[in-house]
Swiss-Prot record:
Role of this protein: Involved in mRNA degradation. Catalyzes the phosphorolysis of single-stranded polyribonucleotides processively in the 3'- to 5'-direction.
Protein name per the record: Polyribonucleotide nucleotidyltransferase
The protein's required cofactors: Mg(2+)
Localization annotation: Cytoplasm
GN (gene name): pnp
Organism: Vibrio vulnificus (strain YJ016)
Domain spans labelled S1 motif: 623-691
InterPro entries: ExoRNase_PH_dom1 (IPR001247), ExoRNase_PH_dom2 (IPR015847), ExoRNase_PH_dom2_sf (IPR036345), KH_dom (IPR004087), KH_dom_type_1 (IPR004088), KH_dom_type_1_sf (IPR036612), NA-bd_OB-fold (IPR012340), PNPase (IPR012162)
């Protein structure tokens, strides 16, 4: 039934990788099953043979989905099936998209969809690297115009050594988690999180990963040669030379002047005016002219004007030199009732950032294929339409917002205290209130400030900076603190976050080939100078965590009880702890070792909860007089509650000095009485006396003061 499948197996570091096609999904344009030590991902590619007429963009969609059966699990929830993509799936989809998108040829606007499905998972092998390899292989055998293949590698830094594709276990001991993707000759994408590594160490890791992934590229080329799919007969559309010249004649000089307007919205208004004028003139002369084509040519002319000016050494769009950072304004404590807040403004980019402290119960539970884990540090990034002066839909976060939030979180993670050092769940929200480039790095700066304002003992201040590149032939200029236009019209988006001593996150997206190690070195060094400048300004506002947390934040009090007393504090069906939390207005968490954490915004509430827990867990002592309540009466005596959950018996002979005929003549239920503990037998039963308490009062000894 099946033709003989094509299988390619190769060694990749410590892992064996297998590429296979020809058996599954034969109606797709291309399909590959990639396996890496029991982690298997099925990747399909479908491309439409024709583009939608008049379409002036490339509709590439990448879907990445993890099936729970891959880990031998059944999905939770009512419907028991996978639903919308998780944050992790969204981030992996972006990781696949970013290095392949620049490799489709200019003018290719046919729709292409990549669907990657994780069908088997080894808990020690993350699926993202095999997915990127499988996507590259599927595109290579599809016949679709694609200037690949690409390779992908994860790089760790363990005991001073770079490690290729470290396992999940090894990553726990690594100071670096870096993913690099690229072609045979160039790096295209870097995504990383680091523990204060130097610029040299980061660059070495990027180069190491790119060198090692050549084995992947070689294997995919051999695999594609064996499959031998004919290439599509696609020809790039011919340039409309006459229209290009017409648009340039009408607009070039005006655009040169427009790009000298430093204020963003005024500049945009002028550019829109020029575009409208050009459109009107050309359509008046030729009503059959394509307005979309005019728009595309006009945009290309904008790009040419800006790039040519930068390469010539002229001041940038907003008048800065290549290595200048925009004006900074840093404020903390801007919102009175939040636990921590900051307003970070850099030029026309602004982030309003808040930090909220919660208990460990507020941690996010992440159910991944490789296992369940808790996340005590959350960072959410919001990009509302008003921040760029537009209207638009407001709803659940888009892929870009999830990606930017994750990047900012990577930048801060290295300086966060452990849950043992600071027993709070911390949620940071960055609201982008103005945007003109590098809002994710503004979020890093704002987060560092808000955390300090909230009293979170982070190890150091963290700042982020976005670098750009304009390269024409052998000439290039590296730009610090890029504007949105410079990002859009340039060749590289290079984001670096770190402290004064090292890098904590690096993200790089390159749109062209030919980025050399020298260019990356210049960008890293230039970013270091910019980062230190921003840190110096931030430190003037706040240079360390506040001495105390906000009065509106919950204060966590820790106490320890014997592990065998946990059941007493919880009570039957949770009745005791439920009553404690409701009556004291606190949140109480009990760990298996007997550690109890009590969170309360008011100190009195916490003290009351502690007092009641101490009562519940206290041990009855022989010879001590207690004030108790009569719980019930019997013919032979009375049961008295002396501590919560602890009753003792006052025998009828121990009620008074004289003979007692009837217990109810002396006691009633609910009556408070003084009793002395006479004995605790082997079964834990407590024998009490009222008459001994009256005759020979013995007070409980105060605990001896501890010596300092």
């Amino acid at each position: 039934m099946f033709e003989k499948p094509v299988v390619k197996t190769f060694q990749y570091g410590n892992h064996t990788v297998t590429l296979e096609t020809g058996v599954i999904a034969r109606q797709a344009t291309a399909a590959v099953m990639v396996t890496m030590d029991d982690t298997a991902v099925f990747v399909s590619v479908v491309g439409k043979k024709e583009a939608v007429p008049g379409q002036d963009f490339f509709p590439l969609t990448v879907n990445y989905q993890e099936r729970t059966y891959a880990a031998g699990k059944i999905p939770g929830g009512f419907f028991k099936r996978e639903g919308r993509p998780s944050e992790g799936e969204t981030l992996t989809a972006r990781l696949i998209d970013r290095p392949i998108r620049p490799l489709f040829p200019e003018g290719f606007n046919n729709e292409v969809q990549v669907i990657a499905t994780v069908v088997s998972v080894n808990p020690d092998v993350q699926p993202d690297i095999p997915t990127m390899i499988g996507t590259s292989a599927a595109l290579a055998i599809s016949g679709i115009p694609f200037n690949g293949p690409i390779g992908a590698a994860r790089v760790g830094h363990i005991d001073g050594q770079l490690v290729l594709n470290p396992s999940n276990t090894e990553l726990n001991a690594s100071r670096l988690d870096l993913v690099v993707a690229g072609t045979e000759s160039a790096v295209l994408m870097v995504e990383s999180e680091a523990d204060n590594l130097t610029e040299e160490e980061m660059l070495s890791a990027v180069v190491f990963g790119h060198d090692q992934q050549q084995a992947v590229i070689k294997a995919i080329n051999e695999f594609a040669a064996e499959v031998a799919t004919p290439s599509w007969n696609w020809v790039a559309p011919e340039a409309n030379t006459a229209l290009n010249e017409k648009v340039a004649d009408l607009a070039e000089a005006k655009l040169v002047e427009a790009y000298k307007i430093t204020e963003k919205m005024a500049r945009y208004d002028r550019i829109h005016e020029i575009a409208a004028e050009v459109n009107a003139v050309i359509l008046a002369e030729d009503p059959e002219a394509d307005a979309k084509e005019i728009h595309t040519i006009f945009h290309d002319l904008e790009k040419t004007v800006v790039r040519r000016s930068i390469i010539a050494g002229n001041p940038r769009i907003d008048g800065r030199e290549k290595d200048m950072v925009r004006a900074l304004d840093v404020r903390t404590g801007v919102l009175p009732r939040t636990h921590g807040s900051s307003l970070f403004t850099r030029g026309e980019t602004q982030a309003l950032v808040t930090a909220t402290l919660g208990t460990q119960r507020d941690a996010q539970i992440i159910d991944e294929l490789t296992g369940e884990k808790k996340d005590y540090f959350l960072l959410h990034y919001n990009f509302p339409p008003y921040c760029v002066g537009e209207t638009g839909f407001v709803g659940s976060p888009k892929r870009r917002e999830i990606g930017h939030g994750k990047l900012a979180k990577r930048g801060i993670a290295a300086v966060m205290p452990s849950i043992d050092e600071f027993p709070y769940t911390v949620r940071v929200v960055s609201e982008i209130t103005e945007s003109n480039g590098s809002s994710s790095m503004a979020s890093v700066c704002g987060t560092s400030l808000a955390l300090m304002d909230a009293g979170v003992p982070i190890k150091a201040s963290v700042a982020g900076i976005a670098m750009g590149l304009v390269k024409e032939g052998d000439d290039f200029v590296v730009l610090s603190d890029i504007l949105g236009d410079e990002d859009h019209l340039g060749d590289m988006d290079f984001k670096v976050a770190g402290t004064s001593t090292g890098i904590t996150a690096l993200q790089m997206d390159i749109k062209i080939e030919g980025i050399t190690k020298e260019i990356m070195q210049i960008a890293l060094n230039q970013a270091q100078g910019a980062r230190k400048h921003i840190l110096s300004v931030m430190d003037q506002a706040i240079s360390g965590a506040r001495d105390d947390i906000s009065e509106f934040a919950p204060r966590i009090h820790t106490m320890k009880i014997s592990a065998d007393k946990i059941k007493d504090v919880i009570g039957k069906g949770g009745a005791v702890i439920r009553a404690l939390t409701e009556e004291t207005g606190t949140t109480i968490e009990i760990e298996d070792d007997g550690t109890i954490k009590i969170a309360a915004t008011e100190g009195a509430a916490a003290k009351e909860a502690i007092r009641r827990i101490q009562e519940i867990t206290a041990e009855v002592e022989v010879g001590v007089i207690y004030t108790g309540k009569v719980a019930r009466l019997a013919d032979f005596g009375a049961f008295v509650t002396i501590l919560p959950g602890k009753d003792g018996l006052v025998h009828i002979s121990q009620i008074a000095d004289k003979r007692v005929e009837k217990v109810s003549d002396y006691l009633t239920e609910g009556q408070e009485v003084q009793v002395k503990v006479l004995e605790i037998d082997r079964q834990g039963r407590v024998r009490l006396s009222m008459k001994e308490a009256v005759e020979k009062p013995v007070e409980a000894e105060a605990p001896a003061a501890e010596e300092e």
